[in-house]
């Protein structure tokens, strides 16, 4: 069974329960995120540039499905996310991001996930951290890790843990319950115990304290 709650003002999904289990932490569902903290780019401003107000509407559908279309403008990028809730318990997300600026630091979504889903199983490039311009040393396959083990200990805290070529991602708790995400197209992901604002405000890795949620970038 699926239960979802949306904010009428912003269009953000504030709650997603799968068979009674909450997936979204603190009402912070999927939104466009531009901020990526790199130590050499401290001058770059944080924030996603999204408008404070968006839209949220239920679209007529057939076959027992429920379709919710959300939109939100922004100075850096505008987003249209259409959620289709299927009778079999699947939530299909169709995402369109339209750049409004010449240079974006990210082109993807971020969500805060409940902290208990710390076990990570993924089909992508791995097992080590990799990026679009340096993934040749890794191989596509299915890998198991944890949110904590996706942390990379750089000399200074910064964005980390990315995996390219994502096709399937599962986040589960100690009992094996959680959420599975399948993707299409060129997609990467990271699942970390810190968000980029937290990394930017911390000078040394040993000073980092885990956030009370998991930051999922897709």
Where are the regions that the model predicts?
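Beta-strand/loop-rich accessory regions of lumenal/periplasmic or secreted enzymes
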Residues: 2-218
């Amino acid at each position: 069974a699926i239960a979802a709650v949306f904010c009428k003002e912003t269009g953000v999904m504030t709650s997603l329960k799968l068979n009674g289990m909450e997936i979204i932490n603190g009402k912070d569902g999927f939104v466009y995120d531009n901020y990526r903290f790199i130590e050499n780019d401290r001058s770059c401003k944080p924030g996603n540039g999204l408008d404070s107000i968006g839209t949220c509407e239920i679209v007529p559908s057939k076959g027992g499905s429920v379709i919710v279309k959300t939109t939100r403008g922004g100075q850096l990028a505008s987003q249209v996310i259409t959620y289709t809730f299927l009778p079999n318990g699947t939530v299909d997300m169709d995402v369109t991001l339209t750049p409004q600026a010449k240079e974006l630091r990210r082109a993807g979504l971020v969500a805060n996930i409940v902290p208990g889903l710390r076990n990570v199983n993924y089909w992508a490039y791995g097992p080590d951290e990799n990026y679009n311009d340096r993934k040749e040393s890794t191989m596509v396959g299915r890998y198991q890790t944890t949110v904590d083990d996706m942390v990379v200990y750089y000399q200074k805290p910064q964005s980390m843990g990315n995996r390219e070529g994502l096709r399937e991602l599962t986040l589960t708790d100690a009992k094996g319950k959680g959420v599975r995400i399948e993707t299409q197209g060129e997609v990467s992901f990271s699942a970390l115990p810190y968000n980029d604002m937290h990394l930017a405000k911390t000078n040394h890795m040993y000073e980092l304290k885990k956030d009370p949620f998991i930051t999922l970038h897709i």
